[in-house]
Amino acid sequence: MIKIISDSTCDLSQEVLERYDIDIIPLHIVKGDEELEDGPQIDIHALYEWADKNKTTPKTSAPSIETAMNVMRPYIDEGREIICFSISSEMSTSINVIRMAAEELDAVDKVTVIDSRNLSTGIGLLVVEAAVMAADGKSREEIKAGIDELIPKVRASFVVDTLVYLYRGGRCNAVSALIGGALALHPMIVVKDGKMDASRKYRGCLLYTSPSPRDA
């Protein structure tokens, strides 16, 4: 059976990973001088506390080639084929690292690397669908063809509660952050064509919204 792997930006729960037999290549989180591997062991609340205390935002970096090789090697040694997903190539060099890892393992003909053109749940949906197809006995070529059809149809979006972290991360300027805070603006961030973009802004206390894909 084809092995499905993704980098950690798919944000799938441990329960889902185990249910669908999906392996993860962790990205790195850089917190000052400390570098951590992304995963369930990360304390999100502690990260926010650190960011607020230090008035900065943790950075992310692509996985190391060694880490990617270590995740893929057991399956290559078993003679299995692999489909590996990465966060959009517009947002990270993760896909290049995975490709180089396949080259180092002399397994380019055994590993199909898919640029999800997305992040978070947008990748997660594709990864789970690929795992279902693999469990159904689909070939690597069939799975890739199916996923290639789905990629342009999957669009992730999220509403930001505060502009502070976008400002600290260089995603918006100080004036926008100041005005946004004063007016209680909450931008909707949409991933489109592999890139993040501000689609619209909500004002006040956002309790629930469910815009149609066309609106997004």
Q: Could you tell me what each predicted segment is?
A:
Residues 78, 83, 91-100, 104-156:
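Active-site histidine-anchored catalytic micro-motif
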Residues 3-62:
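N-terminal glycine-rich anion-binding loop in soluble enzyme alpha/beta folds
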Residues 61-70:
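Glycine-rich, highly charged phosphate/nucleotide-binding loops
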Residues 70-80:
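Glycine-rich phosphate/diphosphate-binding loops that line cofactor/substrate pockets in enzymes
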Residues 208-216:
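Single conserved hydrophobic/aromatic residue that forms the stacking wall/gate
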